[in-house]
Amino acid sequence: MMEILRGSPALSAFRINKLLARFQAARLPVHNIYAEYVHFADLNAPLNDDEHAQLERLLKYGPALASHAPQGKLLLVTPRLGTISPWSSKATDIAHNCGLQQVNRLERGVAYYIEAGTLTNEQWQQVTAELHDRMMETVFFALDDAEQLFAHHQPTPVTSVDLLGQGRQALIDANLRLGLALAEDEIDYLQDAFTKLGRNPNDIELYMFAQANSEHCRHKIFNADWIIDGEQQPKSLFKMIKNTFETTPDHVLSAYKDNAAVMEGSEVGRYFADHETGRYDFHQEPAHILMKVETHNHPTAISPWPGAATGSGGEIRDEGATGRGAKPKAGLVGFSVSNLRIPGFEQPWEEDFGKPERIVTALDIMTEGPLGGAAFNNEFGRPALNGYFRTYEEKVNSHNGEELRGYHKPIMLAGGIGNIRADHVQKGEINVGAKLVVLGGPAMNIGLGGGAASSMASGQSDADLDFASVQRDNPEMERRCQEVIDRCWQLGDANPILFIHDVGAGGLSNAMPELVSDGGRGGKFELRDILSDEPGMSPLEIWCNESQERYVLAVAADQLPLFDELCKRERAPYAVIGEATEELHLSLHDRHFDNQPIDLPLDVLLGKTPKMTRDVQTLKAKGDALVREGITIADAVKRVLHLPTVAEKTFLVTIGDRSVTGMVARDQMVGPWQVPVANCAVTTASLDSYYGEAMAIGERAPVALLDFAASARLAVGEALTNIAATQIGDIKRIKLSANWMAAAGHPGEDAGLYEAVKAVGEELCPALGLTIPVGKDSMSMKTRWQEGNEEREMTSPLSLVISAFARLEDVRHTITPQLSTEDNALLLIDLGKGNNALGATALAQVYRQLGDKPADVRDVAQLKGFYDAIQALVAQRKLLAYHDRSDGGLLVTLAEMAFAGHCGIDADIATLGDDRLAALFNEELGAVIQVRAADREAVESVLAQHGLADCVHYVGQAVSGDRFVITANGQTVFSESRTTLRVWWAETTWQMQRLRDNPECADQEHQAKSNDADPGLNVKLSFDINEDVAAPYIATGARPKVAVLREQGVNSHVEMAAAFHRAGFDAIDVHMSDLLAGRTGLEDFHALVACGGFSYGDVLGAGEGWAKSILFNDRVRDEFATFFHRPQTLALGVCNGCQMMSNLRELIPGSELWPRFVRNTSDRFEARFSLVEVTQSPSLLLQGMVGSQMPIAVSHGEGRVEVRDAAHLAALESKGLVALRYVDNFGKVTETYPANPNGSPNGITAVTTESGRVTIMMPHPERVFRTVSNSWHPENWGEDGPWMRIFRNARKQLG
């Protein structure tokens, strides 16, 4: 039976206005829209009155329900039939944890009520299309129709393909029908294999073969034999990549054989809780570094949010499934798309060349895709710290003559670093009889055929197959699984995981055979033991679907009880679906039909399938010389600063949490004005050291339209110049990931790919001492469609994205682009040696040209000398600022440095040649360094010692003020206000934010950038930052116990525990499941802290599901009430913990006036480094800090204070319960965005109780308790940042 319950309004006023504006633009007479959530409860038994009231209360969240009955025609948008939304999974979990076992499943839709004039059927279809995503949603016209969401179908049996009866044609038909993308020789191989077995193949076996042997999974092109221009080549592409490891194996612990590569890290204190006692402590051991970079291009083209989200999720799983289990740590993300053509902001170089109906626009990708990637990282609890964004789409004269080149099939890059224990780097042995386990969520009928689909050019496969290959994301589930993996590796020698892989392309059909095969075993499986939420799925659908957030593991049979205990505590679902066998055979039994859908020798599936041979021809690009006519420097500057590749990326940065873990030492945002120009990302190796890791990206894809090899060399060079200004040491410490994207089969591209791989793998990297131990390829970067009567193709340039990773000696010595105005000199290190080539530059692109000669690595020895020289200068502390030269050239390098320093530039380019345009806009490798004027001679001497004397040019100095002036020989070449340039540079991000977020907030942020008087972030402290008020109490040896409380989805507990630990507490890991099961109580604790994250993925209001699981369980409710009423206890709630505790007002004395915390005014997750002031309040945690003004990490989507009315707000303030407020950089309390990131009235962001014993706050002091983890800080701070005082105050209060 189904019950329907109304919910809160689903759209804010500005979202409704945007919809109405879109309808008006489409000339649809829609006058008004109202939208509200509707909840559907599938019940297995009727609810009594109390249970019904409880369900209603559970589903009451968000803004208040409209009092009036909605008017207009109903359009009900629900998740696509046959799928279960992430919201449903998490909301159902909450209902069960609150004792509502009669609820089979909760689901949610949006009811749109449309008031309109007379609309034709076609116009209604337009309205419907505007209100839903056909890839993920279904539209109904009556609420009762939602009953179809819960329809259950009978299981369907396996289907046989009549090969023996119909011969080869049966396989050809199945290939088309199932979208298998099998090549002719693979069809021959299968015909031969099954004829020898003497039976017909089942559809599931063919599907499994296609996924396991797709280009996506098998990398056939990279393993192929090559004939180029009739000449047999000596090596495959992969062998040339492996050559880098053979030449420089130094510091690499694992390459090419696992889900990620591993290199040596540093010995540090890894901080985690003991399995038996729950007590957190440091464990001194090597924290080796793992690295991985994936792409998820095809799904992102079809449905950008889930495509990018599952791209990040899959890469995170790769990291976690490395060795015998590892810890993902920090991420990077990248996008290459065609031109944005922002409505009303189209740029002169953007022409509309059309696109296929079935893929979305570049603008859609960049509106939704980054949000999906960021949302997954945010909810999982991994900071996203680095990235790139390129737009390219043009008709150019390239290798194959004049043709369309661009990224209709986008690049969506997802990568990152993690850490792994030394004894877990290598996978274990799988014993015969070992249990084969699926860890994670249930099978669902989604994401079918992703491996094969992403191996085809967009436009080749059937639209329905594209539809089937879209996936859905549930990062909170992945977090639960990762917590289990963490508990396992933390056990050291007792780790129950023998072998682990993630489930990705091809689902279990790919993952399980890979698991057993890699472990040297076969496997026997039972299909019906696989967790499934859809009983009507066929064997093929159960075995081959790509439901996300799953891992496959081998666990020794005697370790299963321990593994079971860990999973239950973390509420991570798992199923034992088989066991390892001696015989290298794969059998899958179906208990329901008592048959064998799979019965194959492993070598048929993974054996010697036909090897590919690529017989290709070389084509050389001629290019046309750049036409300079009509190009002025002033116009070029304005155009280039508006090119999205160059322009400000704030809209891509502030949506992503950049402080979670408390180990982020360098994010994208630089300096007091928080400008996104960092060269690289940096994390500390632990919470107790200054060792660390760095990541940087290099890519220069448009250059490949002129010179394949140069483009590849530049990608490596740019990654190196980006990562150089950190303290790494020997260049051999740097390891690279290479992600290759190409349109295989397109004339000239295959030979070009070979040329590019050879340039990097055989020549440049070995010469530099660089290794590429990991990478990925995507070989179908072409889109085909019909535009009117014309067949069109959009082919991407050959694109190599290099991600560089390194172990750091000291993260504090990372140099940023932020300029200082002390007596200084700016030096350009020009590795282009005066070539100043303009081919395939940003300048060429904004004038719709390609040019002829591009930049290149001109001298490998000088590139190596450059790196070594910068390392020497970093070690000698001679650099004030550093920024590499890249897209946009020297002009952009200097401008970005000036933006970061909020200063002027007085530049002189006289020594850079007579061609001023080329001097300013060439994109040859190099960097600008700022040094003290007094150090200039010593610095030039170091550069000369490294062979760079002829590359160094004095190009002026940074000066106070707002003028950005470039001269040569006393003549002004360019002069403009730095503020004007800053505003131009910001206009793309402003327009994207206006489209995507609340336009009023976007306007306020853009307006703030034009204020030259803005003093930037600043600090005023009312206390001595170096005083340790807890020291006398720590000296007694007593360590009070603090319960570090977490719920499923919480992700900030480790850094919180570390902050309390440093202040003299014993921090104890307490999961809500411990309290609900009675394993742990609160009676032994002196303090309690509820941590940040996404409990239950925030589905029933941020923190509300967590609170209700306490309020609706009598014993646990009493436990919390008793704790809060006990004298001499302290409690802190941060972010999600703040939201949760604000919903426990009925249990917390003196909290009656506390507000609720609701959706930010921007309608967006906000990650900012915000200025707050400590106000006079009873808060015991903030004692002695009143009047202080200091920045703090902010990361939330629902942090806006909501009060009932003005009287409620006045009472809250008059009682003095407000503890922190947002202030602007002038020190004034503010409601203006982004200084106030959520729009809270009067800047309120923390409140306390009347006794001061319980304080809740939205910002994160635990993430910035160490100075090194602050995005910016005054230079005179020591180890501890000012927010450490909160935790020491807590220790002091407890005596």
From Swiss-Prot:
Keywords: ATP-binding, Cytoplasm, Glutamine amidotransferase, Ligase, Magnesium, Metal-binding, Nucleotide-binding, Purine biosynthesis
Keyword Cell wall biogenesis/degradation applies: no
Molecular-function GO terms, alphabetical: ATP binding; metal ion binding; phosphoribosylformylglycinamidine synthase activity
UniProt main location, coarse: cytoplasm
EC class: ligase
EC number(s) per entry: 6.3.5.3
GO biological process, one term: 'de novo' IMP biosynthetic process
Binding positions for ATP per the UniProt entry: 307-318, 678, 886
Subcellular localization: Cytoplasm
Family annotation (CDD domains): GATase1_FGAR_AT, PurL_repeat1
Transmembrane regions: none
Active site (UniProt): 1135 (nucleophile), 1260, 1262
Catalytic activity entry: N(2)-formyl-N(1)-(5-phospho-beta-D-ribosyl)glycinamide + L-glutamine + ATP + H2O = 2-formamido-N(1)-(5-O-phospho-beta-D-ribosyl)acetamidine + L-glutamate + ADP + phosphate + H(+)
Residues that hold Mg(2+) according to the record: 718, 722, 884
Region (Disordered): 305-327
InterPro entries listed in its UniProt record: Class_I_gatase-like, FGAR-AT_N, FGAR-AT_PurM_N-like, PurL_large, PurL_linker, PurM-like_C_dom, PurM-like_C_sf, PurM-like_N_sf
Subunit-level organization: Monomer.
NCBIfam families xref list: FGAM_synt (TIGR01735), PRK05297.1 (NF003672)
Family: In the N-terminal section; belongs to the FGAMS family.
Protein name (record): Phosphoribosylformylglycinamidine synthase
